[in-house]
Amino acid sequence: MAYPFQLGLQDASSPIMEELMNFHDHTLMIVFLISSLVLYIITLMLTTKLTHTSTMDAQEVETIWTILPAVILILIALPSLRILYMMDEINNPALTVKTMGHQWYWSYEYTDYEDLCFDSYMIPTNDLKPGELRLLEVDNRVVLPMELPIRMLISSEDVLHSWAVPSLGLKTDAIPGRLNQATISSNRPGLFYGQCSEICGSNHSFMPIVLEMVPLKNFEDWSLSMI
C-alpha cells in the first residue's frame, strides 16, 4: 500500500502490475535519454559558436529527425500493446465476482455461490480499532483466493465510479448500464487497498476497497461460513 511521501509506485503484487512497472521503467529510460540529448544540444548552442544559424536546407538532418522519433514511438508502443492484450485476456477464471458501485459504497456478489453477497461500507474514523487505516478500512472485506485467475464484473447502480486497486495493476470504470470485466491474480497473500477513482459526488473520497487474498483452503472455509 502507499505510505506518506512515497515517490515510486506501490509494490507489485500481480503479474500485470509487474509488467506495468517494467513498462514504466522502460518508458522512463527513453524519456530520460531524450531529455538528456535535448539538454546537451541546447547547452552546445549556448556555449559554442560552431552553429549554422543561417542553414536553409538540410535533408540529412530532416531525415534523421523524422525516422528517429518514429523508431522511438515503436519501441514504446510494442510493449504497451502487449500489456493491453494481457489485461484484456481472461482464460478459465477460477471465480467470478460481480461488484456494483453505489453512492457511496460497493456491493459484491460471488456468482459461483448461492446467496453469497454483501455491501462494503467505509468504517467511520470514530469506530476504527488501533492499527486500522483511516478512510481505507471497510466493514466487509472482499476475500479472494491467491494465485488463481479471478474475473471481476464491474458496473454501477447510479453514477460513474471506478474500481481501482493500484498494487494489483487494476482500474476499471463502473458505468451504469454497462458491464465491464477485469482479471485479478495475486502472487502473495495479504491486504490490498484501493479506492473509487472517478469523482462520483460529495462522498467520493469515502468509497474504499479492501481485498484480502488468502490461500485456497482459507477461502473455502470463509465462503462456507458466509453461506
Curated annotation (Swiss-Prot):
SUPFAM superfamilies: Cupredoxins, Cytochrome c oxidase subunit II-like, transmembrane region
Job description of the protein: Component of the cytochrome c oxidase, the last enzyme in the mitochondrial electron transport chain which drives oxidative phosphorylation. The respiratory chain contains 3 multisubunit complexes succinate dehydrogenase (complex II, CII), ubiquinol-cytochrome c oxidoreductase (cytochrome b-c1 complex, complex III, CIII) and cytochrome c oxidase (complex IV, CIV), that cooperate to transfer electrons derived from NADH and succinate to molecular oxygen, creating an electrochemical gradient over the inner membrane that drives transmembrane transport and the ATP synthase.
Localisation per UniProt entry: Mitochondrion inner membrane
Topology with respect to the bilayer: Multi-pass membrane protein
Mitochondrion is among the record's keywords: yes
Keyword Mitochondrion set for record: yes
Gene3D superfamilies reported for this sequence: 1.10.287.90, Cupredoxins - blue copper proteins
GO molecular function, one term: cytochrome-c oxidase activity
EC number(s) per entry: 7.1.1.9
Protein's UniProt name: Cytochrome c oxidase subunit 2
